[in-house]
A protein has these predicted regions:
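Membrane-interface extramembranous regions
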Residues: 2-165
Length: 165
């Protein structure tokens, strides 16, 4: 199974939302919008936009596909999809509040780990999302790693900078 199926594949949309929004926020900071003069703050903003984007699927036309991804051991997969969507929204908002940003980032990273079995099921059972094949497992694992890494960087930017010195 190829990592990418074709150029129009939407597997990368959350990644693109993260990268483009982070860079756009940083460009605004470079243009003089002082609250956005830090990469860490712009990354938190990009992550917040990404999680709001992904949360929207929990109630949109992809909802049935997300419900089908929930591992069978969980009762009420419809409720699980709704709850995880709400958690993504709260986490996104928490990333934007300095006092809660680190905790929100850690909680979202844990949420991504908890949701990974649904992605495994979708890939192994050849489920579809929005009428398209689910993300191949190697790409999904790589994306999860990128998202979790971004959350860790957003949660502890000063600690990572000191560790690198």
């Amino acid at each position: 199974m190829p990592l990418f199926r074709h150029p129009n594949d939407n597997n990368m949309l959350p990644f693109f939302v993260l990268v483009i929004s982070t860079l756009a926020l940083r460009a605004l900071g470079a243009a003089g919008l002082l609250p956005l003069d830090s990469w860490a703050l712009c990354l938190r903003g990009g992550l917040a936009l990404m999680f709001l984007f992904t949360a929207s699927a929990h109630w949109g036309k992809r909802r049935r596909d997300l419900i089908a991804m929930v591992p069978r051991v969980f009762p009420r997969p419809d409720l699980m999809v709704s709850v995880t969507g709400v958690l993504e929204i709260f986490g996104a908002l928490g990333l934007l509040i300095p006092m809660t940003a680190a905790a929100a980032a850690v909680c979202l990273a844990l949420l991504l780990l908890a949701l990974f079995p649904a992605n495994v099921r979708a890939a192994r059972e050849n489920l579809t999302i929005g009428g398209r094949p689910a993300t191949p497992l190697p790409l999904r694992a790589l994306l999860q790693l990128v998202f979790i890494s971004a959350l860790i960087i957003a949660a502890f930017p000063g600690d990572l900078r000191r560790a690198a010195q």
